[in-house]
């Protein structure tokens, strides 16, 4: 076995001659002609948002595929480098349509794979269904959306002359000799099953032979390259690797290295790319695509070369391959870059052979050995892959037009088509006439924002605001409250956040959850496993000391429901003496942040907080800045400077002013004046409402003052009249106010009661007048009518017993009545 391995290590360095192959890809089985049918739902329910579903009838049955648009497949401004006839480098940034590349699965097959592109008039890509791979592409000139589906033959005879090679050095071979006896253990090890999410930024170089094969058609070449990258990304996605096309170079005139010998070609290409590609743009690996034959090899890649500038490379041949088989070959050699060996007989996957088999079959699945190799290499040696595209510099060479403002530039609007729409910046990286800025939080409509304009608001009680200074487009740096300042009930500000155990439990398990008792922390965080620990070192969980148990994993209680968790998150439940403890685990393969770790700055006792999984005294955060230093009129920021309250000025909050700090920019000075104006406006509105109410009251009371009120009988007297009407005096006469002037009347006359200002005409004895309302006409009444009792203050002349006088309301006028 060792002898075979030695021959293998030496064999990859043998020279391999190559020549131009002008052969077209060959399919080994007739295609099925299918018409994809779009559906809106399946037998298992409606299609979820963002997913599309199609029926593809081929292979004797109907397949339902579900696909979704991919994100982060190409660099935002993909650079494409070409050469002039004189050898000068040209750069272009072509438009790349990024909403037509899909990934998905086949309904009913959980291990299926679908990778399709719809950018060029139909489906183009591969499908892995029930251990068989298929390639699909549109039927040329079809008017009915017809497609051709080819089965990618995986028989051994097809690939008997097409092997894979990888470049190793003596150290790598020696390591394999040492590990060869552990192959049995290796086959059952799935330590690589959980892996961190990684981004491989790849630069592709097209050699002149492949460029000629595409008849120098740049557009067609780019179309196929985008499809290849989409397929490779889908294949590597199952191990948590994202492939990002970061750049492209085409050798338009001639090959810049000699590609005719395996050993020399790979070394020459790795050296060339480290001297030419690396200075132009940062990347993780670079592959050279060619049509030259490599003595029966599908390509050759540097083993464990990722993140090493002079070794992160590979050469892959396009000779006699379809897009599907070539994409699988690229993924195979990327696997070598990521530390994967060729599969041995003891390696297994769900198919007879796996993608890292030496024969490079059209299979998309990785074996247990590949997972182990990948994990062993990448866990400590490929930290460059953990950085996202947003944390890396795309271009290392400073130049105008790259969209990055560099030294000597006033602005940079990027490509010409973007500059044409920019009102503030010109294509030569200078400002337009009349503009003072082109970007920044303190720039609006090509002008600086005025002094005191807030450019970054505080987001919580541990944050501080910043204001523009009126002379720059930049907003001051983001400052926040000094670490260790108390917040909420028992918390402390730490790095712009106020962490609280109860809130952390509620974020994980929902409303009602609270931090658990001390028992849960002691019992679980001292285990030193995925459920409870105080950190990870060298892939080993660290047990918490008793003094640090509050700073390990968060432990919760009062959990009534288990919410949906992210991938690979497991909820753990335990009981200790009728105490329920709830928590989440963490393993080395989780892609996102650990929601279950106790955050730094969380309280772990009186005057103690958690820092780096240890419970320390709060005095460790002390500085020369304190509330007393700010004269208790402000608070310290993370630069240990006073951020003064309103009405006081920095640096020490001793002088009257408008607040802020020496770091935050000048706060607005019109705040008090505005408040006074608002108060005046409010008072005026209230005064206006009061005047309106007073006016309406006066208007209603005016007619009442013009009328003379008649004093009505008291309630007691009214009740007396109603209860004993037969006891009225023989002569019932109205009472008159003392100031009344009453003319004499005859015994037969009947007089109504009148107010002092009234004049009463004489009436005949038979005249009888009823009680009427003002302005009413008085009909005659019988003499037997009774009269209301009058107040004692009135004086009344004598009348006859037959006289009955009705009471009249004020302002009534009594006309004379003739005797009946």
From Swiss-Prot:
Side Extracellular, residues: 194-674
Cystine residue pairs: 307-384, 347-369, 349-354, 455-475, 625-636, 630-642, 644-653
Entry comment describing in which tissues the protein is expressed: Expressed specifically in testes.
Membrane topology type: Single-pass type I membrane protein
Signal peptide as annotated in the record: 1-18
Effect of residue 115 to F: In a cutaneous metastatic melanoma sample; somatic mutation; increases the adhesion of melanoma cells to collagens I and IV
Residue intervals annotated with topology Cytoplasmic: 696-820
Domain Peptidase M12B as annotated: residue spans: 198-390
Protein name as it appears in the record: Disintegrin and metalloproteinase domain-containing protein 29
Lineage: Eukaryota, Metazoa, Chordata, Craniata, Vertebrata
């Amino acid at each position: 076995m060792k002898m075979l391995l030695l021959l293998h290590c030496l064999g990859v360095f043998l020279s391999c001659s190559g020549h131009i192959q002008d052969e077209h890809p060959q399919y080994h089985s007739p295609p099925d002609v299918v018409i994809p049918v779009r559906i809106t739902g399946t037998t298992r329910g409606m299609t979820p948002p963002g997913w599309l579903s199609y029926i593809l009838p081929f292979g004797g049955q109907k397949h339902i595929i579900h696909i979704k648009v991919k994100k982060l497949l190409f660099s935002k401004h993909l650079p494409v480098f070409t050469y002039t006839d004189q050898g000068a480098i040209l750069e272009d940034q072509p438009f790349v349509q990024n909403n037509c590349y899909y990934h998905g699965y086949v309904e009913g097959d959980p291990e299926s794979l679908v990778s399709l592109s719809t950018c060029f008039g139909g489906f183009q890509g591969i499908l892995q269904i029930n251990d068989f791979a298929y390639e699909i592409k549109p039927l040329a000139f079809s008017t009915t959306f017809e497609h051709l589906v080819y089965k990618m033959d995986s028989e051994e005879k097809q690939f008997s002359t097409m092997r894979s090679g990888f470049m190793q050095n003596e150290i790598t071979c020696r390591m394999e000799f040492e590990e060869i006896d552990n192959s049995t253990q290796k086959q059952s090890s799935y330590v690589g099953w959980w892996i961190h999410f990684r981004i491989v930024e790849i630069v592709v170089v097209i050699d002149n032979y492949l460029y000629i094969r595409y008849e120098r058609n740049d557009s067609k070449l780019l179309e196929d390259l985008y499809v290849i990258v989409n397929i490779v990304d889908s294949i590597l996605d199952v191990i948590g690797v994202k492939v990002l096309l970061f750049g492209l170079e085409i050798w338009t005139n001639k090959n810049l290295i000699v590609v005719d010998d395996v050993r020399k070609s790979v070394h020459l290409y790795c050296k060339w790319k480290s001297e030419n590609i690396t200075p132009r743009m940062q990347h993780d690996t670079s592959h050279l695509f060619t049509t030259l034959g490599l003595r029966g090899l599908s390509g050759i890649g540097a083993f464990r070369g990722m993140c090493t500038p002079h070794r992160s490379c590979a050469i892959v041949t396009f000779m006699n391959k379809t897009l599907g088989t070539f994409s699988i070959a690229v993924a195979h050699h990327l696997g070598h870059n990521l530390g994967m060996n060729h599969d041995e007989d003891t390696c297994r996957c769900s198919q007879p052979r796996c993608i890292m088999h030496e024969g490079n079959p059209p299979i998309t699945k990785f074996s247990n050995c590949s997972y182990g190799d990948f994990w062993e290499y990448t866990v400590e040696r490929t930290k460059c892959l953990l950085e996202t595209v947003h944390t890396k510099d795309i271009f290392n060479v400073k130049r105008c037009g790259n969209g990055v403002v560099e030294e000597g530039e006033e602005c940079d609007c990027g490509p010409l088509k973007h500059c044409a729409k920019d009102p503030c910046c010109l294509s030569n990286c200078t400002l337009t006439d009349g503009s003072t800025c082109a970007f920044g939080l303190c720039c609006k409509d090509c002008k600086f924002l005025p002094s005191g304009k807030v450019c970054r608001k505080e987001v919580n009680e541990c944050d501080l605001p910043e204001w523009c200074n009126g002379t720059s487009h930049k907003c001051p740096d983001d400052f926040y409250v000094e670490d260790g300042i108390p917040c909420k009930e028992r918390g402390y500000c730490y790095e712009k956040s106020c962490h609280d155990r109860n809130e952390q439990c509620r974020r994980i398990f929902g409303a009602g959850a609270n931090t658990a008792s001390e028992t849960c922390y002691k019992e679980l965080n001292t285990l030193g496993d995925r459920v409870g620990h105080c950190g990870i070192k060298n892939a080993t969980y660290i047990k918490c000391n008793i003094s640090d148990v509050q700073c390990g994993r968060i432990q919760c209680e009062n959990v009534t429901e288990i919410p949906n968790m992210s991938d690979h998150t497991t909820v753990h439940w335990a009981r200790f003496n009728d105490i329920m403890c709830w928590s989440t685990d963490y393993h080395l393969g989780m892609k996102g942040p650990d929601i279950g770790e106790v955050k730094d700055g969380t309280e772990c006792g009186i005057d103690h907080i958690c820092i780096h999984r240890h419970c320390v005294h709060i005095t460790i955060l002390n500085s020369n800045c304190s509330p007393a230093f700010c004269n208790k009129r402000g608070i310290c920021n993370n630069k240990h400077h006073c951020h003064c309250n309103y009405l006081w000025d920095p640096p020490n909050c001793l002088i009257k002013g408008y607040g802020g700090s020496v770091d935050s920019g000048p706060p607005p000075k019109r705040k008090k004046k505005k408040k006074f104006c608002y108060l005046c406006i409010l008072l005026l509105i209230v005064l206006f409402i009061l005047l309106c109410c007073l006016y309406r009251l006066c208007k209603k009371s005016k007619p009442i003052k013009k009328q003379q009120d008649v004093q009505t009988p008291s309630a007691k007297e009214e009740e007396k009249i109603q209860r004993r009407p037969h006891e009225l005096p023989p002569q019932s006469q109205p009472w008159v106010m003392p100031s009344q002037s009453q003319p004499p009347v005859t015994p037969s006359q009947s007089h109504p009661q009148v107010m002092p200002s009234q004049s009463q005409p004489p009436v005949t004895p038979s005249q009888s007048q009823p009680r009427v309302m003002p302005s009413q006409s008085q009909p005659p009444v019988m003499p037997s009518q009774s009269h209301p009792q009058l107040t004692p203050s009135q004086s009344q002349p004598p009348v006859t017993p037959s006289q009955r006088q009705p009471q009249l309301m004020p302002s009534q006028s009594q006309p004379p009545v003739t005797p009946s």
